[in-house]
Amino acid sequence: AGFGTGLNAFLTLLHSEGSGKKIQYTSIEKYPLDPAIVKSLNYPLLSGDAGSNFFNAIHEAPWEKQFNITGDFSLLKIKADLTDYIPDGAYDLIYFDAFGPGKQPEMWTPQIFDTIASVTVKDGIFVTYSARGEVKRNLIRTGFKVSLLPGPPGKRQFIRAVKC
C-alpha cells in the first residue's frame, strides 16, 4: 500500500531480477507523485543503467492496468484510497508504507488491518516502519505473529509480521 516514490517496487524488481521468481506487484496510491518529482529522485544512480531503465519503466507504466516490466515482474498501480478500496486476490508480501498513525490515522484502523489479514496468505509477510503498540496489537488480533527488527538510520525499529 502506498506506491509513493516507487522505491519498494524498484528494490523488489532489482532483488528479484535473475531469481527466476515471477512477481506480480500491486500497489495502491491515492496521490501519485508529480513526474517532475520522480525525475528528481536519485534511486536509479544506485544501480547502473539497467536499474535506471527499470526505474523509468516502473514510473512510466500505466495506472489501472497490469503491465510487464520484465518477463518475470509485472506491475499493477491502482489509483485509489486504501480506506475505500476492496482488494481481490491473495498476497504473499505487503509493504505497508503509509505515513505513521499520527499523520494518517485513517490508514491504521482495525478495519484496515481486518482487510489486510483477509488478503494475506498463510505465512505471508507484512512489513511497516511503524512499530507503535496499536499497530502490533492490531496485527496480533488479526492473526499475525509480530517481530520487531532494527530499523534503518533514524528509525529504531520496524515491524515484520507473519500471517499464522
Task: Give the ranges of each region predicted by the language model.
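SAM cofactor-binding core of SAM-dependent methyltransferases
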Residues: 1-59
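Short beta->alpha hinge that forms the Motif I/post-I loop of the SAM-binding pocket
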Residues: 30, 108, 131
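S-adenosyl-L-methionine
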Residues: 37-88
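A short SAM/SAH-binding and catalytic strip from SAM-dependent methyltransferases
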Residues: 92-107
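Conserved beta-strand signature within the Rossmann-like core of class I S-adenosyl-L-methionine
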Residues: 93-95, 122-130
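A short glycine-rich, Lys/Arg-flanked "PGG" loop and its adjoining helix->strand segment in the class I
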Residues: 106-123
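Class I S-adenosyl-L-methionine
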Residues: 132-164
